[in-house]
């Protein structure tokens, strides 16, 4: 076994760099590389163990360069056998249970291909061609900002998704009208390139360079829903694109878990990082005048509210020149209303 990764625990402060809070983990296998398409696959695991050999055979047939299987504890008895049978699979053994976003962050640190397809163990690829064809479709045939050939179209491309009953799932997420208890609504993509606020269930093909540049997922958020909301809002605020494609399709073998949109500390963190900052000209800031309403509505004591607000201000200041727009602009991609009106200060979020 080879132990990799930082021995740090996940920090309570908001990370400003991609990998400053990666946990410790163990890697087994993955010595071989299947191809040179530029696209690797990440397999996230939840629930019962599905037909793993069948899954890995399908991924081999698709021709992914590398396959990373993120294994929650406890480690399964057949890992050594599987790593010998499938030497292109890199088994990442977690020492503790990690959130969805933390698992994707960790997988990103384990591959060097420009594209990464995040999938679940209860999914199957239905259409889209092999890895080479999928990567080719996403190529922009332009140079990336570093002057290298092979730039890709967007931060994340979301495939069509089917239920276990072969029904098309509403995988587009759009902001809802203001003052609702729900924050997003699911729609089925009707055309190629339809925008989505975030990749549902974390599933999609990610541009690794763009992903790392925006900081990946915030590991301090434990709710998968608010991790995805934070990732999606930050991506759009910073000028990135998340869109759906109808040229790739995956199917669930069992129904995915429903999204838990409960509010709490994760919502407050999301609010401070994405909704509260004010964007002017070429930068953003979190003004002190936002603090009184945050204190009154956060249900926190003065000390905790000050600490969290100050932390949010520091994070916004450190990244202030990354902003390209404000929440109203993001909302205008789908709605005539304002996202800032729809996402109120903590404590007001459930008002009608």
Give the label of every model feature segment.
Residues 2-57:
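N-proximal low-complexity "stem/linker" segments adjacent to membrane-targeting elements
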Residues 56-93:
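Acidic donor-binding segment of Leloir-type glycosyltransferases
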Residues 94-111:
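Glycine-rich, basic loop-to-helix element that forms the pyrophosphate-binding segment
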Residues 114-126:
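Short beta-strand-to-loop acidic/aromatic patch adjacent to the donor-nucleotide binding site
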Residues 147-172:
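Short beta-strand-to-loop element that shapes/binds the nucleotide-sugar donor at the catalytic cleft/hinge
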Residues 175-197:
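Short, flexible, basic/aromatic active-site loop/helix in glycosyltransferases
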Residues 198-199, 203-206, 210-215, 221-248:
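A short, conserved alpha-helix in the catalytic core of glycosyltransferases
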Residues 241-343:
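Active-site-adjacent helix/loop segment of glycosyltransferases
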């Amino acid at each position: 076994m080879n132990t990799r990764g930082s021995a740090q625990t996940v920090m309570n402060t908001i990370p400003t760099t991609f990998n400053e809070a990666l946990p410790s983990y163990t890697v087994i296998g993955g010595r071989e590389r299947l191809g040179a398409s530029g696209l690797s696959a990440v397999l996230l695991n939840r629930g019962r163990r599905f037909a793993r050999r069948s899954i890995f055979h399908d991924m081999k047939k698709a021709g992914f360069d590398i396959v990373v299987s993120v294994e929650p504890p406890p480690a399964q008895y057949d890992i050594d056998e599987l790593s010998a049978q499938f030497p292109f699979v890199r088994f990442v053994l977690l020492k503790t249970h990690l959130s969805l976003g933390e698992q994707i962050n960790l997988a990103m640190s384990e591959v060097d291909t420009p594209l990464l397809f995040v999938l679940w163990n209860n999914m199957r690829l239905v259409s889209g061609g092999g890895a080479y064809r999928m990567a080719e479709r996403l190529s922009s045939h332009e140079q990336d900002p570093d002057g290298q050939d092979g730039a890709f179209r967007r931060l994340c491309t979301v495939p069509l998704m089917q239920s276990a009953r072969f029904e098309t799932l509403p995988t587009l997420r759009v902001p809802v009208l203001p003052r609702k208890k729900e924050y997003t609504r699911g729609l089925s993509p009707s055309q190629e390139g339809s925008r989505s606020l975030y990749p549902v269930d974390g599933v999609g093909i990610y541009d690794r360079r763009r992903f790392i540049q925006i900081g990946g997922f915030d590991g301090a958020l434990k709710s998968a829903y608010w991790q995805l909301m934070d990732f999606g809002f930050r991506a759009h605020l910073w000028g990135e694109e998340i869109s759906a494609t109808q040229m790739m399709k995956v199917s669930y073998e069992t129904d995915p878990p429903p999204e838990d949109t409960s509010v709490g500390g994760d919502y407050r963190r999301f609010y401070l990082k994405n909704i509260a900052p004010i964007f002017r000209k070429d930068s953003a800031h979190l003004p002190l005048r936002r603090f009184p309403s945050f204190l009154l509505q956060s249900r926190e004591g003065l000390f905790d509210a000050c600490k969290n607000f100050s932390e949010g201000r520091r994070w916004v200041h450190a990244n202030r020149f990354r902003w390209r727009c404000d929440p109203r602009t993001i909302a205008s991609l789908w709605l005539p209303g304002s996202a800032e009106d729809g996402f109120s200060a903590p404590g007001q979020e459930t008002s009608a």
